[in-house]
UniProtKB/Swiss-Prot annotation:
Subunit structure: Tetramer of two alpha and two beta chains.
Entry superkingdom: Bacteria
Top-level EC class as recorded in UniProt: lyase
Listed name of the protein: Tryptophan synthase alpha chain
Record gene name: trpA
Family matches, as InterPro entries: Aldolase_TIM (IPR013785), RibuloseP-bd_barrel (IPR011060), Trp_synthase_alpha_AS (IPR018204), Trp_synthase_suA (IPR002028)
Recorded metabolic or biological pathway in which this protein acts: Amino-acid biosynthesis; L-tryptophan biosynthesis; L-tryptophan from chorismate: step 5/5
Length: 278
């Protein structure tokens, strides 16, 4: 079965360019603003949209994304409301893939089977669940694949050649390479190290590889995009959003444009280079 992610990466390969993958927390700073930003992302240049599912114990997230999750929870964001945002986005945008990223606990509480039915119906294309290792594929990964939802796995600098086949076994859509060891937003990605790591992953899979963590500027995104099929930017966008909020954490008049302006600049950087693999 061909998914939106398969189609998008195949189209980009024909165009000879990498994808800009954007991450924002659903419901940050509120559901209405979150949907407005999401609707504006494709036109600004986002090729794939990652949406965070807010969770009370986000162990892999740095301070910026943790704070975004807390703002979203304070605004009343739930997993059901996150799916509603995707559903509303889909009313006007059929082509751009949407990937939900987060932790297993909210999905487990929602109910895996019910979640997959609702996610598919809402227009979700893929899942990144950071705390489910390959050894637990029966929990969510295999049911997701059966439901026609891509399951995207993370590879890191510490994922060696012995471990990589297990990580990649049931991965689909793309592989997410975490360019630094640690939490989101903590350091800058090293493009030489990224190039070597992506080449190593490519020896084990034909899937597109997207690189995230440590990419904050159009220049950095362009450097990384030379080595892979996509550059993922999250913390920088969350920081741009946060900078527009008032003292109570409410959206300001330029909250949407602050995010989309940065996305447009990042897109210009990413789309202006030809990946080595193209």
């Amino acid at each position: 079965m061909t998914t939106r992610l398969d189609t998008r990466f195949a189209d980009l390969k024909k165009e000879g360019r990498a994808a800009l993958v954007t991450f924002l927390m659903c419901g940050d700073p509120d559901l209405e603003t979150s949907l407005a930003i999401m609707k504006a992302l494709p036109k600004a240049g986002a090729d794939v949209i990652e949406i965070g599912m807010p969770f009370t114990d986000p162990m892999a997230d740095g301070p910026a994304i943790q704070a975004a999750g807390l703002r979203a929870l304070k605004a009343g964001t739930t997993l059901k409301k996150t799916l509603d945002v995707v559903r509303n986005f889909r009313k006007g945008e059929a082509a751009t893939p949407v990937v939900l990223m987060g932790y297993y606990n909210p999905i487990f509480i929602y109910g895996v089977d019910r979640f997959l039915v609702d996610a598919k119906e809402a227009g979700v294309d893929g899942l990144i669940v950071v705390d489910l290792p390959p050894e637990e594929d029966e929990e969510l990964c295999l049911p997701a694949l059966k439901a026609g939802v891509n399951f995207i796995r993370l590879a890191t600098p510490t994922t060696d050649d012995k471990r990589l086949p297990a990580v990649l076994a049931n991965t689909s859509g793309f592989v997410y390479y975490v360019s630094i060891t640690g939490i989101t937003g903590a350091a800058a990605a090293d493009d030489k190290q990224v190039g070597e790591a992506v080449a190593r992953i490519k020896r084990h899979t034909q899937l597109p590889v997207c690189v995230g963590f440590g990419i904050r500027t159009p220049e950095a995104a362009a450097r990384i995009a030379r080595h892979c099929e996509g550059a993922v930017v999250g913390s920088a966008l969350v920081d741009a959003l946060r900078g527009t909020l008032d003292a109570e954490g409410k959206a300001g008049p330029n909250t949407v444009s602050a995010v989309t302006d940065l996305v447009a600049a990042l897109a210009q950087g990413v789309h202006g280079v030809k990946p080595v693999s193209a």
